[in-house]
Amino acid sequence: MNAVNESAATTAEMPVPFVFTDAAADKVKQLIDEEGNPDLKLRVFVQGGGCSGFQYGFTFDEEVNEDDTVMDKNGVQLLIDSMSYQYLVGAEIDYKDDLNGAQFVIKNPNATTTCGCGSSFSV
């Protein structure tokens, strides 16, 4: 398990491999509170599929796997497995609530193309 504390990492020390915004962490905290299970963590993953080749997935998980990278933010843990990590380095995981609806959004600098809905990408 690799632990990343976003608030403690600086560019001079170790660059933060991805950004987990306050808005995303706060929404995850709200959802965990609604579930009534404080052991839940948000798992973000990449899998094959979608119209561009890869797609993002989000799920709650109680277990931290040996190959997971863990980021703590505002009392919430974000998990990314080692396979997905390589596709998400430098990405920003955010939560948006606007005219297009409410959803988690990933801004991924590694994606060379994305589909119109933003849920799939290619590298």
Swiss-Prot record:
One of its GO terms (biological process) is iron-sulfur cluster assembly. Keywords: Iron, Iron-sulfur, Metal-binding. Iron-sulfur cluster binds at C51, C115, C117. PROSITE patterns: HESB. The keyword Coiled coil does not apply. Its cofactor is iron-sulfur cluster. It holds the Pfam family Fe-S_biosyn. Binds 1 iron-sulfur cluster per subunit. GO terms for molecular function: 2 iron, 2 sulfur cluster binding; 4 iron, 4 sulfur cluster binding; iron ion binding. NCBIfam families: iron-sulfur cluster assembly accessory protein, PRK13623.1. Required for insertion of 4Fe-4S clusters. Homodimer. Belongs to the HesB/IscA family. HAMAP family: Fe_S_insert_ErpA. This is Putative iron-sulfur cluster insertion protein ErpA 1. It comes from Burkholderia vietnamiensis (strain G4 / LMG 22486) (Burkholderia cepacia (strain R1808)). The lineage of its organism: Bacteria, Pseudomonadati, Pseudomonadota, Betaproteobacteria, Burkholderiales. The gene is erpA1.
